[in-house]
Amino acid sequence: MPHFVINNRFQKLTKSRGVRVEHILTDEILSDICRRITGHDDFTCDFIDAEAEGRLAVLHYGNRVAYISYSPHEVGGRNSYFQSVPTAMASFYEELNQRKNLYFYFVPSIGSSYETLYHLFMYRLMLTAGIDFLNDEDYITRPIHPFISPDDLINARDRLSGRNSSNNSTYATINDYGGIDVFCKTYGASKYESTLLSVALAFLSDQRINVYQILEQNLRLLPERSRNIISSFDNTNLIEADYTMERIEFEEGNSLRSPRYLYNLLATLGPKKCALCGCEIPELIQGAHIWPVAAIKRIRRSIEEKIELATDGNNGLWLCENHHKMFDEGIISINMQGFVDIRPDMTRFNVDFIDWSTPSRQLRPHILTNSFLWFLEKRYEVPA
């Protein structure tokens, strides 16, 4: 007979209210879960007097095992809604029985929305990462489909970020070599989204996936179990983007393209798109410094302050290779009103080419922040 094993004590707030898992996962709900997985309504269940690691039920039947993550039963933040999913995923990956499946089940919720744009994106991410839904048709009014390619996933993430960039902490993009870079914040609820995003991309792509853990001064990594999941894929490369890496890159060259700089550009400017011609081919788009790294190295500041300036998201533009080269060589410049100026000694033929290849001759207003203009002023400042 199918048998559930479930830890009965919730973590955090619900613990003080006397709510236990058995109050949420009632016999009716467990019977429904059992029927949807095994085809049978009857089951046995052990509620263990132990603290639950997230919202997880484990069902043993025959020689198989099912891990079931379930939705919260009360209102919470959008990230907290999904933070138990990677925990269930970690337990699933640690399971030695290879005849196993990972599921998600919707439980009735008090005052919660199941269909915000963020929820729908995360559902697609979960499907792509190998999680099957048991009863989505009872709660979701539109069909949910997994992503079909890395570009499909990244574009959907970018559209979501554009609507609510203040809450965005995990980014993915195609790099110069055609591989995939994932930039992860490693604290708070963001770390759970980082795990799901990385796993989904690993399922979708045969290309190399660099997963950068953007570490702050406390040097906090992704949870060990999340790191183990990500590292279990042959095409993933888990990298600690810490201060030591930034310092080495800063000191060894003048064209800093560090993970933190790219992360900050994505956070400040959004997805890769040339500011002057609109090219959106990510392999061709580069982060162009406004105040050059070589100039920053020469100022009298501490090394920490110099790195902070060199990796600031306001100290840069997304430019295609063509416009980046013209900008660095001084063939074109940007004035304090955001207009593109062409060097006066250029031939008429070359001016015509630049005009033709630069349909956007003025930067968009949202780029021209006070911080950006400060870096622009520094670019053209004559050294004392």
Language-model segment annotations:
Residues 274:
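The canonical Cys-X-X-Cys-His
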Residues 1:
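Carbohydrate-interacting/catalytic domains
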Residues 4-36, 40-262, 279-284, 358-362, ...:
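A boundary/linker detector
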Residues 287-290:
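Histidine-centered catalytic micro-motifs used for acid/base chemistry in nuclease
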